[in-house]
Design a protein with these regions (language model features):
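Glycine/small-residue-rich loop that forms an oxyanion/phosphate-binding "nest" at active or ligand-binding sites
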Residues: 1-23
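Flexible glycine/acidic-rich beta-alpha junction loops that bind and position SAM and/or redox cofactors
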Residues: 2-6, 77, 133, 170
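Catalytic alpha/beta core domains of metabolic enzymes, predominantly
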Residues: 9-10, 22-129, 138-145
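C-terminal helical cap(s) of enzyme catalytic domains, especially alpha/beta-barrels
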Residues: 134-159
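Flexible, glycine/charged-enriched surface loops at secondary-structure junctions
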Residues: 159-166
Length: 174
């Protein structure tokens, strides 16, 4: 509680609002932090680590202030990682949430999680925070090489990459 109270106090004291802030639903006091951000007009990117987190987001009452639901998979076994991503995605899909659903893997399961996400029609994210390795197992020289591999993965599926040309969302409540 003390940590979330400090976070809320920091949010209330912001001089300049960020476009969005990522809040992990597995952290204590996440609801208070999300509500404080939304009151300030800051979009929330909800970091989901478990099926319970996905359910909590759906029932939280903060979805109108969410720009994105980030399905974060840290499971180390490929089949289990993909299964967990699918279970979390199913909770969000059934609830027909409006925020973008983005999948994000970790370590050796990153590329399996991303491939699965693309098959589901979801957005993906990759960088050195997630993995140091390319899909073929070789060491990446940097973020650009990881992103390049993800772009090729997207193009192989015949999908478009939206980003800078996408219309920006206004702040929550506007």
């Amino acid at each position: 509680e003390k940590i979330s109270a400090r976070k809320v106090s920091s949010i209330e004291g912001l001089k300049v609002n960020p476009d969005f802030a990522s809040v992990n639903l597995n952290e204590e006091g996440w609801r208070d932090v999300c509500k404080a951000l939304i009151r300030r007009g800051v979009w929330v990117e909800a970091g989901l680590w478990t099926v319970a987190d996905a359910r909590s987001l759906v029932s939280s009452g903060i979805l109108d202030g969410c720009v994105r639901a980030l399905v974060e998979i840290t499971e180390k076994r490929p089949k289990q990682a993909v299964s967990l991503a699918n279970q979390m995605d199913e909770v969000l899909r059934r609830a027909r949430i409006k925020p973008t659903i983005l999948h994000h893997g970790y370590g050796q399961t990153t590329w399996k999680v991303l491939e699965n996400a693309l098959a589901l029609g979801r957005d993906i994210r990759v960088g050195l925070e997630d993995t140091l390795y390319l899909p073929d197992g070789s060491l990446a020289r940097g973020n650009a090489q990881l992103v390049g591999a993800a772009v090729r993965m997207v193009h192989r599926r015949g999908l478009l990459i939206l980003g800078l040309d996408s219309p920006a969302k206004t702040s929550p409540g506007s």
